[in-house]
Amino acid sequence: DNTLTLALRQVANLSAGKVLTGGSLALAVPVLKNNGLLQVGGDLTLTGDSLDNSGDISARTLTLHHSGAQTHNAGAKLQAQLEAVLSAATLTNNGSVLADRLSLTSDTLVNGGQLQGTKQLDITTTTAGNSGKLLTDGALTVKASSLNNGGTLQGEAINLTGDSADNS
């Protein structure tokens, strides 16, 4: 098993910082700030209270679970070759999140960047605000009590479920 597991209180991977492994990585950190490169050849699991990402994170599969805020700032890149599963109380994206299959779960989603699941994009949230792009060549599913869309929704099939939607 080529898995590295780390449980730390805080990690700051600064702009010149690089974390590289050909295997898998499980990182349990209450507060993770990434401005550098986090590149994993296998599966990457990040868990904790919050993630503040301004750098590049890539892996074969990604699982990111944060009980508080998960933020992908402008210029940030999050990429999974196969599947990415992101969950947080508040998920804010102003960068680029790309996977074959992308699944997001949050209480609040604020997207000003690009969320792209090449084959599938699933979003489950209470409140969704999109001024960016939600893209897929397959099925786009958004389950939200409230959806405010001023951006782009693109998919072969689009399924919106919720109480209210504003598409202006």
Regions inferred by a protein language model and the residue ranges of each:
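Residue-level signal for pocket-adjacent positions within structured domains
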Residues: L27, L46, T92, G129, ...
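Low-complexity/repetitive intrinsically disordered segments
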Residues: D1-L8, T161-S168
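Short "repeat-start/strand-capping" segments in structured domains, especially the N-termini
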Residues: D1-L4, T21-L25, V40-T45, S58-T63, ...
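Short, T/G/N/S-enriched strand-turn elements that build extracellular solenoid repeat scaffolds
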Residues: L14-L20, L32-Q39, L51-S58, H72-Q79, ...
